[in-house]
């Protein structure tokens, strides 16, 4: 009986969270599906839009800067990232796959990544998005020990991996 209670106590939050992951809504402007709320990469292929094909194409062709990646790999310890993005957004279609490519090559623990997909008003009910003061997407927010280190808003000023390295060097 104790085992059943223990397993229920552990599994119930996971089940509840997973039911709120990769939720779909209709983009009223383009009349197609978009992701809304907490998401992960698996959600990209579940919506009826061109986000997944754009994601896959950009991920495949993007080449990271090896020297910067070596530097960046030394700065990831204790880092958490919140990504606020939109599957309807052209900049998200370009920069989100590049971000994932960088993090994949660095073997970043994706459990330390929170992805929030927003609507055209930059809202995502049931998430922390409202408290993040995001006006443009994608916005990459980097934390260490719950302290915000910096953001990349919409488009990096240099290579994405270089901007991340600058932020994590603080």
Descriptions of predicted regions:
Residues 136, 141-170:
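Non-catalytic, surface beta->alpha helical segment in thiol-disulfide oxidoreductase systems
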Residues 1-23:
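Bacterial Sec-dependent N-terminal signal peptides
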Residues 101-107, 130-134:
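Short, surface-exposed basic-aromatic patches at helix termini and helix-loop junctions that form
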Residues 121-135:
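Short Fe-S-cluster ligation motifs
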Residues 73-105:
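Local sequence-structure signature of Cys/Sec-based thiol-disulfide redox active-site neighborhoods
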Residues 94-97, 127, 162:
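Generic recognition of short, well-ordered alpha-helical segments
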Residues 17-75, 165-170:
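Non-globular targeting/processing and membrane-anchoring segments
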Residues 81-87, 110-124:
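Thiol-based oxidoreductase modules, predominantly thioredoxin-like and allied folds used
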């Amino acid at each position: 009986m104790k085992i059943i209670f223990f397993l229920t106590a552990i599994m119930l939050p996971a089940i509840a969270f997973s039911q709120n992951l990769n939720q779909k809504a209709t983009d009223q402007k383009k009349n197609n599906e978009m992701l809304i709320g907490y998401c992960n990469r698996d959600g990209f292929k579940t919506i009826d839009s061109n986000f997944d094909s754009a994601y896959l194409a950009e991920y495949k062709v993007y080449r990271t800067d090896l020297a910067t990646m070596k530097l960046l790999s030394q700065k990831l310890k204790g880092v958490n990232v919140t990504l606020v993005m939109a599957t309807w957004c052209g900049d998200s279609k370009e920069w989100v796959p590049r971000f994932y490519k960088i993090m994949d090559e660095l073997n970043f623990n994706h459990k330390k990544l929170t992805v929030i997909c927003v609507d055209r008003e930059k809202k995502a009910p049931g998430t922390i998005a409202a408290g993040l003061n995001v006006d443009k997407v994608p916005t990459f927010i980097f934390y260490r020990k719950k302290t915000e280190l910096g953001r990349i808003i919409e488009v990096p000023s240099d290579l994405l991996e270089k901007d991340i390295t600058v932020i994590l060097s603080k």
